[in-house]
From Swiss-Prot:
Family: Belongs to the P-Pant transferase superfamily. AcpS family.
Chief site of localization: cytoplasm
Its biological purpose: Transfers the 4'-phosphopantetheine moiety from coenzyme A to a Ser of acyl-carrier-protein.
A GO CC term attached to the entry: cytoplasm
Name of the protein this chain belongs to: Holo-[acyl-carrier-protein] synthase
Keyword Lipid biosynthesis: yes
Record localization: Cytoplasm
Length: 133
């Protein structure tokens, strides 16, 4: 059952300006893994903007305060298949992960960006317990 849906849209230029003006701030918003992933690209701003949108979209479904780095976007490497990485997913600090588990919730994430905007949608789903056959 769907519990909540969150969406965020951000201008990539906003993140680019932040990176140019306040390089130290990036470490307050993003994990080292997120920064390393985005740093592989000539222009890291679109990737970081999508990750910022994911954090904002999650905030819209998780109505309690948390730190920027308590939620992050991760991508596991896939050993097989046509793409080197699996679909993006959200990672959580232990307190959030524990509550999500207790409630039986999982978060689904999709990211996209154009030249000007990045967007993220988070769907919070309750996994219903199914009786054994």
């Amino acid at each position: 059952m769907i519990v909540a849906v969150g969406h965020d849209l951000i201008e990539i230029a906003r993140i680019r300006r932040m990176l140019e003006r306040e390089g130290v701030r990036a470490e307050r918003l993003f994990t080292a893994t997120e920064l390393a992933y985005a740093g592989r690209y000539r222009d890291p701003a679109p990737s970081l903007a999508a990750r910022f949108a994911a954090k904002e979209a999650f905030q819209k479904v998780w109505l309690r305060p948390h730190g920027w780095r308590d939620v992050w976007v991760e991508r596991e490497r896939t050993p097989d298949g046509p793409f080197p990485y699996a679909a993006p997913m959200l990672g959580f600090a232990p307190a959030i992960a524990g509550e999500m588990h207790e409630r039986g919730w999982v978060a689904h994430l999709t990211l996209t960006h154009t030249r000007e905007h990045a967007s993220a949608v988070v769907i919070l789903e309750h996994l219903e317990q199914r009786a054994a056959p």
